């Protein structure tokens, strides 16, 4: 199970890097971005950055901030929807803690591979019985829809004409900036900490805790080898993600918690068929034994009456 989680985390990181660089092609001779995503989304973003920077005289740093905020606001509903699904899953796990916790305890205390497999099957069966997805309720579609925007603005912040020679608050945008790297790491760490808010299920908390360090570490590593213009985009993105997390924690989660509790009040959850320590229902008959003994006693008395 642990090896699967490690593989999933590594695959997620590799996939993010692949998508960020793969959505937009780069011409090998000129080093400039090309392709459908760039022409459709990236180039207009670059023009918007240039418009705010030169036509409005705001400078490239402020222009990158403005365009990043606009793009983030456009895709915010997708991010909220993605978080809504994950939060709904989390609240179901919290509400059904009394059903799932025994299986999770068995899984932790299992010593043999057979016991672990049996405990996993019991846990998956209990989750399936109560409509809880084993994948955390997070669909791929909202993430895939957002990725072209992330990729396009990543290249727009880096390749917009004039940005490499500009500076923002004394920071050259064409070379890496340790100040912005530190800011990006702190912001993504805070966002990861906020994602723990309201999560009561122990297994979920453990999974989120692993990601708390993964996401900031990835951003820091990428930022160390990226120009400050790109890191500035990630800093603004970190602020927007914290805003999104506040919306989820204090608006979305309370509503979903109320909804889940109302549904459970109308349809109280039944104990799982795999809730006994052995992983099976206890079907040992009790009453028939007493009936059998009465029948035997009656037959014994009947025999005595015949002998008389």
Curated annotation (Swiss-Prot):
Disulfide bonds: none annotated. The keyword Manganese does not apply. It comes from the Bacteria. A lipid is attached at residue 23 (S-diacylglycerol cysteine). Residues 269-278 have a biased composition (Polar residues). GO terms for biological process: protein insertion into membrane; protein transport. Residues 263-308 are annotated as: Disordered. PROSITE patterns: PROKAR_LIPOPROTEIN. The keyword Protein transport applies. One of its GO terms (molecular function) is membrane insertase activity. Residues 1-22 form the signal peptide. CDD domains: 5TM_YidC_Alb3. Its main location: membrane. A lipid is attached at residue 23 (N-palmitoyl cysteine). GO terms for cellular component: plasma membrane. Required for the insertion and/or proper folding and/or complex formation of integral membrane proteins into the membrane. Involved in integration of membrane proteins that insert both dependently and independently of the Sec translocase complex, as well as at least some lipoproteins. Belongs to the OXA1/ALB3/YidC family. Type 2 subfamily. This is Membrane protein insertase YidC 1. The lineage of its organism: Bacteria, Bacillati, Bacillota, Bacilli, Lactobacillales. The gene is yidC1.
């Amino acid at each position: 199970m642990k090896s699967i989680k490690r593989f999933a985390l590594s695959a997620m990181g590799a996939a993010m890097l692949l998508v960020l660089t793969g959505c937009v092609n780069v011409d090998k001779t000129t080093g400039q971005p090309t392709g459908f995503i760039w022409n459709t989304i990236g180039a207009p973003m670059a023009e918007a950055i240039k418009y705010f920077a030169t036509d409005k005289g705001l400078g490239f740093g402020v222009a990158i901030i403005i365009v990043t905020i606009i793009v983030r606001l456009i895709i915010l509903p997708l991010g909220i929807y993605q978080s809504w699904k994950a939060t709904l899953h989390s609240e179901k796990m919290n509400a059904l803690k009394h059903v799932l916790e025994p299986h999770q305890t068995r899984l932790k205390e299992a010593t043999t591979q057979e016991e672990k497999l049996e405990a996993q099957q019991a846990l998956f069966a209990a989750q399936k019985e109560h409509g809880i997805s084993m994948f955390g309720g997070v669909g791929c579609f909202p993430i895939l829809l957002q990725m072209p925007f992330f990729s396009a603005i990543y290249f727009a912040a880096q390749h917009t004409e004039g940005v490499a020679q500009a500076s923002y608050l004394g920071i050259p945008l064409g070379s890496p900036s340790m100040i912005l790297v530190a800011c990006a790491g702190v912001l993504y760490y805070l966002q990861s900490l906020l994602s723990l808010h309201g999560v009561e299920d122990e297994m979920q908390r453990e999974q989120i805790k692993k990601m708390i360090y993964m996401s900031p570490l990835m951003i820091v590593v990428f930022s160390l080898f990226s120009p400050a213009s790109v890191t500035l985009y990630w800093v603004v993105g970190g602020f927007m993600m914290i805003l999104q997390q506040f919306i989820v924690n204090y608006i979305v989660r309370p509503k979903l918690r109320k909804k889940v509790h109302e549904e459970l009040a109308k349809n109280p959850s039944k104990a799982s068929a795999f809730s006994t320590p052995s992983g099976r229902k206890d079907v040992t008959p009790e009453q028939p034994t007493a009936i059998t003994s009465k029948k035997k006693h009656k037959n014994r008395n009947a025999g005595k009456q015949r002998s008389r």
